């Protein structure tokens, strides 16, 4: 069986040019032009994705089999092309009969070429002309087949792109904003068969998230919690240190008190009086020599730099790699209602952070069993829809969830992940062995565990094992206070 790609190769048909023309026609279609005008970011994303679509179409051409009649005619053409003139003339009647029997598009032209020859025999030039016209007929048939297949692929691809563009246009304000990188990752998540009603569930929770801005801020703070930290440097050299020092100046500026000196110009009146008494004159001169006369002290102040060298402890910032999110969501009955909506909206907010920062987001629902969804996989939107469709009506088995998290963190791909537990933490006490294992991961592997507490009534003993506790109380009083502060 000959593939369409092989037949095109034998007939020197350039399929790459055909595919390139199809793509250019597709991009110029009015349906896509409307989307590109409304969402310009998606045009760049789609352009980036074009090589993959071209490769898929070329692969489709390679895997498409040639119709049996066309394959048989091509094999007959190859057979007659290799014949000598005598053998060609000998087999010509059988060939004409075969073309007529197969209703070949070349039959009419072949009969006309031979009808012009009275002897029903061909010379060398007529043989060459016959084979050229036959090859041209085969080429036209192959081009027609290629075009039919490409038209079918174009319609299929156009329908797929329209669906994905419509979905991305609806979800971009919820999960990507105007971030082109996030929009590109969102585009990658939209593969799969989804109807409009399916992804409207994400839009609804996106609207709810917009009405609870504190949830989005909490997710962003949690995502930024692994910032670069200052680390002291041990090999810091000594540096020159400048310190301003104030010292008295000899320049007279103001009276600053009394002192003993030999300054005649600033003598106090009692000292001058002793000079006029003959009995005390010798005492005056003795005190003058000893600089013990009471005088006014006039002085100012001056500042200068005191330069010293001392060792300075330098610090450099050690960037902390931001790994994936592993989010454990409590689906017990106490997490139903408003708590359930907040939990799902918070997971969407974390997905938004993950798309913007090129991180993975893995959701684990824990009740009586653990159910997992990876929202950043190739079918992430489909998995997100299945997650949002879940109902929180189970029990609380936090220990089983943490066991599953520890197993996931042991995987090399998830070694740098941040584990986030979303619950009201109204649960049974954790086993001591599990607490020890969590502590070991925190201390030896430097892995971080976050608790998002959705109630003020959670058990403190359970939450002590977490590195960070983020509180979002969903009680009526807290909801009213948050609404009043907006």
From Swiss-Prot:
- What subcellular locations does the record give? Cytoplasm
Source taxonomy: Bacteria, Pseudomonadati, Pseudomonadota, Gammaproteobacteria, Enterobacterales
Superkingdom in the source lineage: Bacteria
From the UniProt record, report the name of the gene that encodes this protein: viaA
Family named by the database record: Belongs to the ViaA family.
Name of this chain's protein: Regulatory protein ViaA
Q: Which HAMAP family match?
A: ViaA
- Its job: Component of the RavA-ViaA chaperone complex, which may act on the membrane to optimize the function of some of the respiratory chains. ViaA stimulates the ATPase activity of RavA.
SUPFAM superfamilies attached to this UniProt entry: vWA-like
Q: Does the keyword Cytoplasm apply?
A: yes
């Amino acid at each position: 069986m000959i593939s369409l790609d092989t037949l095109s190769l034998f007939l020197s048909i350039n399929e790459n040019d055909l595919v390139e023309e199809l793509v250019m026609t597709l991009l110029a279609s009015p349906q896509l032009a409307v989307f590109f005008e409304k969402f310009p970011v998606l045009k760049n994303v789609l352009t980036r994705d074009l090589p993959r679509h071209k490769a898929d179409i070329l692969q489709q051409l390679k895997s498409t089999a040639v119709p049996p009649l066309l394959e048989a005619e091509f094999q007959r053409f190859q057979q007659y092309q290799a014949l000598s003139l005598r053998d060609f003339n000998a087999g010509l009647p059988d060939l004409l009969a075969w073309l007529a029997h197969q209703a070949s598009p070349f039959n009419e032209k072949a009969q006309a070429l031979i009808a012009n020859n009275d002897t029903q025999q061909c010379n060398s030039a007529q043989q060459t002309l016959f084979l050229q016209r036959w090859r041209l007929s085969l080429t036209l048939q192959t081009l027609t087949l290629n075009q039919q297949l490409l038209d079918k692929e174009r319609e299929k691809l156009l329908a797929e792109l329209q669906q994905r563009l419509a979905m991305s246009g609806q979800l971009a304000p919820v999960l990507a904003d105007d971030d082109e990188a996030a929009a590109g990752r969102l585009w990658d998540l939209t593969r799969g068969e989804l109807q409009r009603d399916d992804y409207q569930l994400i839009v609804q929770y996106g609207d709810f998230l917009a009405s609870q801005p504190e949830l989005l801020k909490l997710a962003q703070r949690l995502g930024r919690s692994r910032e670069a930290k200052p680390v002291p440097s041990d090999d810091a050299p000594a540096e020159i240190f400048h310190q301003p020092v104030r010292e008295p100046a000899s320049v007279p500026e103001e009276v600053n008190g009394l002192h003993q000196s030999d300054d005649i110009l600033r003598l106090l009146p009692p000292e001058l009086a002793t000079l006029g008494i003959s009995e005390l004159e010798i005492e005056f001169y003795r005190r003058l020599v000893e600089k013990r006369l009471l005088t006014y002290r006039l002085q100012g102040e001056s500042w200068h730099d005191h330069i010293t060298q001392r060792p300075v402890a330098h610090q450099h910032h050690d960037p902390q790699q931001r790994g994936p999110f592993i989010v454990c969501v409590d689906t017990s009955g106490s997490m139903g209602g408003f708590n359930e909506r907040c939990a799902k909206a918070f997971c969407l907010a974390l997905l938004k952070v993950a798309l913007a920062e090129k991180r993975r987001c893995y959701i684990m629902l824990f009740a009586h069993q653990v159910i997992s969804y990876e929202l950043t996989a190739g079918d992430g939107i489909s998995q997100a829809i299945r997650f949002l469709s879940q109902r929180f009506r189970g029990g609380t088995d936090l220990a089983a969830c943490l066991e599953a998290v520890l197993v996931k963190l042991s995987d090399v791909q998830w070694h740098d992940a941040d584990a986030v537990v979303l619950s009201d933490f109204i649960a049974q006490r954790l086993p001591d062995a599990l607490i020890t294992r969590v502590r070991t991961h925190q201390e030896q592997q430097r892995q971080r565990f976050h608790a998002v507490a959705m109630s003020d009534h959670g058990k403190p003993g359970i939450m002590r094992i977490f590195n960070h506790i983020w509180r979002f109380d969903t009680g009526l009083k807290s909801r009213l206070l948050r609404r009043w502060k907006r």
